Structures are given as structure tokens and as C-alpha cells.
């Protein structure tokens, strides 16, 4: 009888610990407010600067490393948190006739991971992989 109670308590403790670990490791939902500021990342031959302002306006600057050529896009940003991974959407882009779509994952207050940008919703990546991930660091 005492042995069965001991096993019951041990099993219950293990279950509580596993639940605690799962809930603590869940990915935080990034909000535009938490992403406000300037972010810098490098991907392939590009240095990428993403600036998110408090009024949901944002700019994306792509600098091609060897030539120093710069492409800049200005628009409105939002995050769709209805599905995981979360989508970062840049709309009303002055320089383009289309929107830009990406995935976003907040690693901590100073690092975010984003996928390559796509001009079509159906063609944007569905997961973050080593090949398609841009690691942005907050510029302080």
C-alpha cells in the first residue's frame, strides 16, 4: 500500500515537472510594440536593416555587400499570430505594388529570427530553416 502511494506521488511529480517544462518553453508571441526599434541582420550577400516605428510604420533597407547598392522599402507592418510560426506582413509599400511576407520568431528582447521575404502569401516559407532564416539583432 505504501509502495503504491510512493509510485503515485512519483508519477504525479513527473507529470507536473513535464507540464511546467512545456509551458515555460512555449514561444512568446512577438508584438510590434516589443519589436520597435532598428534591427540589423546579414543574409547571403545582403546587410538588412529593419526599422519598426511606434505607429506600425516600418522600413526595410537591403544593402548589397560588394556594390554598396541600397534598396529601401517603406510601409505598414503587422504580425499575424493566428498560426505558428507567426507571420510578419509589410503592406502599403510605397516602392512596390505588392506586400512582403515573412515568418518571425522572437528569441529574446534583442534577437529575432525572420524568414526570407516573399511577395506572395502562398509562396512565403512555412517554417524557419537554417537556409531561409535571417538573424536580426537589435541596434542599440
Describe each model-derived feature in a short phrase:
Residues 1-7, 77:
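Positively charged n-region of N-terminal signal peptides that target proteins for export
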Residues 24-38, 51-53:
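N-terminal helix-cap/turn-to-beta initiation motif at the start of protein domains
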Residues 54-58, 83:
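Structural signal for glycine-centered tight turns and loop->strand junctions in beta-sheet-rich domains
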Residues 113-130:
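Short, exposed beta-strand-loop hairpins at the edges of beta-sheets
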Residues 139-140:
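Short, solvent-exposed mixed-charge patches
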